[in-house]
């Protein structure tokens, strides 16, 4: 007899509910949000052949890959569609939501969502962190330009090392403004150093991936673009 399992995940605990093919509740409980204790309870109360459903969320990739690694049949469900179905419940609790997910798995009224590999998520995190620092350097350079323009000092349209040198040259004759601008410029330099660290990590990742190496043979394709495209497809 097939069993169906619903998981309602929060940061610390996960509510688990097991139902049979008739919709009868067989077991319901709570355990720590970790693949090992969750898989142990599912195997004990539902069996390794049970169909398990979990909503999309920030912790979903880690849990799904961990549970699949334990041999469980786990489906990731679109949270927006699940929310519409669970809104019909009178009492909204984690345990009831887990039972609702189990019933959705039983009826088959769900849309499975692809869960990208952990390697793809690592590439995405790397590119996201780099993008944040690039945005911060842009905002800092714009602020430096704005402060200098207020006092008639124009660094021009240079970027990178050229911008750095122009600002330093302008500050030599304006010590009062240097008190404000130099700390900003020092922070800007540190951010660029960290961006260079990320760039090196991206290139290492590209060299280790045969697909990325192949894409890099296309003219004008950069390591950042190749990593973004290959990571989004996994």
Please provide the spans of the model-predicted regions.
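A detector of single, family-specific signature residues
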Residues: 1-234
């Amino acid at each position: 007899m097939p069993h169906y399992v619903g998981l309602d995940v929060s940061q610390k605990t996960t509510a688990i509910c097991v139902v049979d093919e008739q919709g009868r509740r067989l077991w319901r409980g709570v355990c720590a949000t970790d693949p090992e204790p969750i898989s142990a309870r599912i195997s004990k109360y539902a069996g390794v052949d049970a169909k398990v459903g979990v909503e999309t969320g920030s912790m979903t990739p880690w849990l799904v890959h961990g549970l699949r690694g334990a041999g469980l049949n786990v489906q990731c469900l679109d949270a927006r569609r699940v929310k519409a179905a669970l809104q019909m419940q009178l009492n909204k609790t984690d345990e009831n939501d887990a039972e609702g997910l189990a019933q959705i798995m039983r009826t088959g009224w769900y849309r499975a969502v692809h869960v990208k590999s952990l390697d793809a998520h690592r590439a995405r995190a790397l590119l996201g962190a780099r993008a944040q620092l690039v945005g911060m350097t842009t905002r800092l350079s714009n602020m430096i330009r704005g402060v200098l323009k207020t006092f008639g000092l124009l660094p021009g349209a240079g970027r990178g090392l050229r911008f750095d040198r122009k600002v330093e040259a302008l500050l030599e004759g304006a010590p009062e403004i240097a008190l404000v601008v130099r700390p900003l410029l020092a922070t800007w330099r540190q951010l660029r150093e960290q961006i260079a660290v990320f760039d090196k990590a991206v290139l290492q990742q590209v060299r280790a991936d045969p697909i990325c190496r192949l894409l890099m043979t296309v003219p004008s394709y950069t390591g950042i673009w190749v990593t973004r495209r290959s990571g989004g497809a996994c």
